[in-house]
Amino acid sequence: MRDISWLTSRPIAHRGYHDKSRGCLENSQSAVQAAVDKGFAIEVDLQQSADDVPIVFHDDTLDRLTFESGPVRQRSAAELTGIALRGTDDRLWTLDDLLDQVDGKAGLCIEIKSRFGRTPERAFIASIAASLARYSGPVAVKSFDPEMLALMREAAPDIPRGALGDGARDLKEWGRASRV
């Protein structure tokens, strides 16, 4: 497993260094660049597109941060990357786009979003693992879904993984934590 000391050695900009009042939204190119410029590590979220491409976006639906609506998972990466974020010059982007922009200059803590109760998509996890394999900077992944982390362990055992929880419901879910 890789060195994880970077996770506690400097601040981590949650969803990038964003500030809505200056037109810099969470998980955007601008927020990520601002975090890099400040010397912070960066936490971002990944949603699955209809064609299994990791999209840098927090919400399950497009409604809150774009002028579009509906689930992210029902659109292709080509469709999603054409969607502008409200009030900005930024658009939705892929994990590969993010990795190209950051270019190893910052640690990345990546949250893999989940469809709890449904079979996790191996192709989606494989795509994430393949992209992260080429990243030259430090990286770790996390998820609320133990199945996603178990699949990441299979696909990329050297990438550090972290389990997230938000209540008693998770105690039952994380009973299988040895697979993570």
Predicted segment positions?
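Phosphate-group recognition and catalysis centered on beta-loop-alpha active-site segments
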Residues: 1-180
